[in-house]
Design a protein with these regions (language model features):
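Catalytic phosphate/metal-binding cores of nucleic-acid and nucleotide-processing enzymes, i.e., regions
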Residues: 1-118, 127-144
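Short Cys/His-rich metal-coordination motifs, predominantly Zn2+-binding knuckles/fingers
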Residues: 124
């Protein structure tokens, strides 16, 4: 049972790690900003207020990354003006942005996003669907062995 935003966050991360273990995940640390010293330290290290809860940074054919903002599954939430501005900022810069409290909806969006993931060749401009095709490309085109 998903009782709160944290449960939802954990469950989505578990899904991504299970089905897409090589994905590059970056978690926002907003919930950990509970003291003035932590907030100041995080700000100096580059943390932004209203940063997305989770980002997937794998190379995608259409997007620069996937941003997910989790909301409480109890339907007892509101979206702040700053969060709308954040969504627009990331969307306008080429990121796919999901704001949701629905695990099933998030799963569908994540799986849909992952279909567009491509692995770039380090030696040319081509991109590949999976490691096997990339490794074959390295062997055949660039004459590289594992």
């Amino acid at each position: 049972m998903i009782g709160n935003e944290t449960d939802l966050h954990y469950k989505v991360v578990d899904l991504i790690r299970r089905y897409y273990p090589d994905s590059i995940l970056v978690a926002g640390l907003g919930e950990n900003q509970d003291t003035e010293n932590k907030r100041l330290d995080s700000y100096k290290k580059g943390y932004m207020r209203e940063q997305p809860d989770l980002m997937v940074l794998d190379y995608h054919k259409e997007y620069k990354g996937l941003c997910i903002e989790f909301k409480s599954p109890t339907n007892n939430y509101r979206v702040s003006k700053a969060q709308y501005e954040l969504m627009n900022k990331y969307s306008n810069n080429g990121y796919k942005f999901i704001l949701s409290n629905d695990y099933d909806e998030i799963c569908i969006e994540v799986h849909d996003y992952m279909k567009g993931i491509r692995l770039p060749c380090k030696y040319c401009v081509k991109h590949f669907h999976n490691k096997n095709t990339l490794e074959t490309h390295y062997r055949v085109i660039h004459r590289l062995s594992n």
